[in-house]
Amino acid sequence: KWIMVGRLDVNTSGLLIFSNNGDLVQKLSHPSSAIKRYYLCRVFGNPKKSQIKKLLNGVEIDGNKSCFDEIIPMKKKTNAKNNWFKVSLHSGKNREVRKLWETESLQVSRLIRIGFGPIELPEDLKKGQYRCLEKNAVERVIKLTGMEG
């Protein structure tokens, strides 16, 4: 039986990971695993440096402190209606990326998960396609959890 690691909400696309090892899925999915997730975000508007700083230092969401580990602008356009950012965070709470931006009154208009720990979404992999991980990639993922291979 294949089990999905975490999930993507209805308005998010990108990398999905499946495994037939329930213990591994549990360890990878749980927020306490602190495995970095990487996303491309299209944000409506032009965030100020002060807003970016707040999102990196931490804001309160649903009674808990949350922050991005990094926010990297992609092709900065000062007068653009939308701007793309590569972001990473180490927890996987429900809609966390969107909620973080929303604390600064910024709306995410597109969200794509491009990485989960050492696994990256291949650029040549089209929507709806899949690819099995190489053995060394599986071993790196297992090592992240502290499980034996």
Segments (PLM) and residue ranges:
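Basic, flexible Lys/Arg- and Gly-enriched helix-loop patches that mediate nucleic-acid binding at interfaces
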Residues: 1-149
